[in-house]
């Protein structure tokens, strides 16, 4: 093996272990967020049984479904990390070369900005093509609120993928794909814009204290997450449609989903669970710290 291959393998392993630990640690927050996002589109949660908010959700889940149910869908989330990272590594430089080759970020800012969005969107869409079914299964398993095996819609990851494929074909595993790609581009635009502005306001960006850099990264991640959150809500709602027939289908398509959520639930509905998403983002910062520590050991 070449030195570059060994270095990649070490990074891949350290990143995977760090991601598995952090994703498992924040899985309960992630499940609360998903339930608040999709409960309106769930066949299992009656209107009078819907969760009133984050605290109500945290209190009721262990009572109604057991403590371990906080980690429903976490395995799919952990597995998803490895192909995503490998694909990002494979495509990232290629897309940067295509969209940003020969562009000077100092003299051609807007071209650099557009190229960054295009390369990020293209890399994200390419990775999503391969890992989207895992993201889909993660959402459906987290939204499954039955306590016993007989009450639950799916027995596990494999059962979820097989049942939906039998019912709707491969297409069923890709519900909400288009809006997911749009969300990636919006997230990158917000992240890139806010981060660039924040860094530009610092007196000496290159010699910024690590705590200040961490706080900026946290703030930027939170702001970008809130900006792109409605797209995440719509895609999760679309995921809930797979496996349904006739009158059970709530939305005719993505545009109809946007319209109905706004009309029936109001603009606030697009941001259900957004606060728990911000808390989960702190777990992302933990990953970076953990990743650096693991690299020292491996």
UniProtKB/Swiss-Prot annotation:
Record Pfam families: Mito_carr
Q: Does the keyword Transport apply?
A: yes
Q: Which residues carry this modification: N-acetylthreonine?
A: 2
Modified after translation how? Trimethylated by ANTKMT at Lys-52.
Q: Which residues carry this modification: N6-acetyllysine?
A: 105, 268
Which of the residues bear the PTM N6,N6,N6-trimethyllysine? 52
Membrane topology listed for this record? Multi-pass membrane protein
The source's domain of life comes to Eukaryota
Which purpose does this protein serve, as stated in its record?
ADP:ATP antiporter that mediates import of ADP into the mitochondrial matrix for ATP synthesis, and export of ATP out to fuel the cell. Cycles between the cytoplasmic-open state (c-state) and the matrix-open state (m-state): operates by the alternating access mechanism with a single substrate-binding site intermittently exposed to either the cytosolic (c-state) or matrix (m-state) side of the inner mitochondrial membrane. In addition to its ADP:ATP antiporter activity, also involved in mitochondrial uncoupling and mitochondrial permeability transition pore (mPTP) activity.
Which protein, by its recorded name, is this?
ADP/ATP translocase 3
């Amino acid at each position: 093996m070449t030195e570059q291959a060994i270095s990649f393998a070490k990074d891949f392993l350290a990143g995977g272990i760090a991601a598995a630990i952090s994703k498992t640690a924040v899985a309960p927050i992630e499940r609360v967020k998903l339930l608040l996002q999709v409960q309106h589109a769930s066949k299992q949660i009656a209107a009078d049984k819907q969760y009133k908010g984050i605290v109500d959700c945290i209190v009721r889940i262990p009572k109604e479904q057991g403590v371990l149910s906080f980690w429903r869908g976490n395995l799919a989330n952990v597995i998803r990390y490895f192909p995503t990272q490998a694909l990002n590594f494979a495509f990232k430089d290629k897309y940067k070369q295509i969209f940003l080759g020969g562009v000077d970020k100092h003299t051609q800012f807007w071209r650099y900005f557009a190229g960054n969005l295009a390369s990020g969107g293209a890399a994200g869409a390419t990775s999503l093509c391969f890992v989207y079914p895992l993201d889909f299964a993660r959402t459906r398993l987290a939204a499954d609120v039955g306590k016993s095996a007989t009450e639950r819609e799916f027995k596990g990851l494999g059962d979820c993928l097989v049942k939906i494929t039998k019912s709707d074909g491969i297409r069923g595993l890709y519900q909400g794909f288009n809006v997911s790609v749009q969300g990636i581009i919006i997230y990158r635009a917000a992240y890139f814009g806010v981060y660039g502005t924040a860094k530009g306001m610092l007196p000496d960006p290159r010699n910024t204290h690590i705590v200040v850099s961490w706080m900026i990264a946290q703030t930027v991640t939170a702001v970008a997450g809130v900006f792109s959150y409605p797209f995440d809500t719509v895609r999760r709602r679309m995921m809930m449609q797979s496996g349904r027939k006739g009158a059970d289908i709530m939305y005719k398509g993505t545009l109809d989903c946007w319209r109905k959520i706004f009309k029936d639930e109001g603009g606030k509905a697009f941001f259900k669970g957004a606060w728990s998403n911000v808390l989960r983002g702190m777990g992302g910062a933990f990953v970076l710290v953990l990743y650096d520590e693991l690299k020292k050991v491996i």
